Amino acid sequence: MIVTETIIRFENVTKQFDNDPPVLDNVSFEIEKGKFYTLLGPSGCGKTTILRLIAGFLEASEGQIYLGDKVINQIPANKRPVNTVFQDYALFPHLNVYENVAFGLRIKKLKKDAIDEKVKEALRFVNLKGYEKREISEMSGGQRQRVAIARAIVNEPEVILLDEPLSALDLKLRTEMQYELRDLQKRLGITFIFVTHDQEEALAMSDEIFVLNKGEIQQSGTPIDIYDEPINKFVADFIGESNIVNGKMIQDFEVEFVERRFECVDQGFRPNEVVEVVIRPEDLEITSAEKGQLQVTVDWMLFRGVHYEVGCIDTDGNEWLVHTTRKVRVGDKIGLAFEPEAIHVMRLGETEEEFDKRLDSYDEVQ
């Protein structure tokens, strides 16, 4: 049996500025020790506010924030065992790499030998051994980020907060740094809390994802859970690309949409309950019109390198997005085929607690 330890807990936390609507609205969640968490959502959803509340840069309007079993609402930022890597890295341009990393240790008045040992160890961890005397102005974007991370880990915090640290990097370097950050977190065993609006980053790096919108957590879970079983239309649309249509749950394992009935793997709905149906573009297979479960017309096509992105319209006017390696032409009449497992049925207005309970019932039946 795996024993988990909660390191951070929010209980009914609200953050409001003046008389504006709450930036965070009655948010509760737990962060387990030693995992990589991502706070994911669009601009203004509240993800950076959560980070700043944990760091101590903001104070909650309501609710309690715990570190372990201790309430930290009133503990100042410099007294919390937390370090932050900012979007712009916040390095000191007049200090070299060594002095940037050593800065926090000097504030703590550690002995010179201890500082030297810790700084060199931190730089080894981020693959910057031998860069101690390098000026910050001489470093690339990826190297500067490594310096910022070394400065964070040298203080041996219990939690490292990362506020969109990859956003300024080009695509190739960003992908490399995703791997490096994930590998570093595993080697250190420290809890990482990463903020991003990039869905691919979140899916690639995280043990757990919290999807936020309008100051509320819409869904939390593993990347696979959230991608395969989105709780609502916002999550389905925000995480990857989705085809979403209105439907009706006829009975367990049978759903109706586009005026046809299909076998599915969902259950626990009321007979004839109005629902929303999601099918991912990569789960649709292009066939001949006669063999397809849906008959559509190709409306447009884009080449994306590893696949074609094909936009189609069915006879009812619904738009369908398909990812395929098969080349078609605009105006072609084609069929779309899919397996029952590709259909995901979403209950309107379902809470995360209700959603989790329904998914648990699937496991019990299986």
Curated annotation (Swiss-Prot):
Matching CDD domains: ABC_PotA_N (cd03300)
Gene Ontology MF annotations: ABC-type putrescine transporter activity; ATP binding; ATP hydrolysis activity
Entry keyword Lyase: no
Intracellular or extracellular location(s): Cell membrane
E.C. no: 7.6.2.11
InterPro entries linked: AAA+_ATPase (IPR003593), ABC_SmlMolc_Importer (IPR050093), ABC_transporter-like_ATP-bd (IPR003439), ABC_transporter-like_CS (IPR017871), Mo/tungstate-bd_C_term_dom (IPR008995), NA-bd_OB-fold (IPR012340), P-loop_NTPase (IPR027417), PotA_ATP-bd (IPR017879)
Catalytic activity reported: ATP + H2O + polyamine-[polyamine-binding protein]Side 1 = ADP + phosphate + polyamineSide 2 + [polyamine-binding protein]Side 1
Membrane disposition: Peripheral membrane protein
SUPFAM superfamilies listed in its UniProt record: MOP-like, P-loop containing nucleoside triphosphate hydrolases
Domain of life per record: Bacteria
CC per GO annotation: ATP-binding cassette (ABC) transporter complex
Pfam families, per the entry: ABC_tran, TOBE_2
Its biological purpose: Part of the ABC transporter complex PotABCD involved in spermidine/putrescine import. Responsible for energy coupling to the transport system.
Family per similarity comment: Belongs to the ABC transporter superfamily. Spermidine/putrescine importer (TC 3.A.1.11.1) family.
PANTHER family referenced in this protein's UniProt entry, alphabetically: SPERMIDINE/PUTRESCINE IMPORT ATP-BINDING PROTEIN POTA (PTHR42781), SPERMIDINE_PUTRESCINE IMPORT ATP-BINDING PROTEIN POTA (PTHR42781:SF4)
Name of the protein described by the UniProt record: Spermidine/putrescine import ATP-binding protein PotA
Organism: Listeria monocytogenes serotype 4b (strain F2365)
Classification lineage: Bacteria, Bacillati, Bacillota, Bacilli, Bacillales
Gene: potA
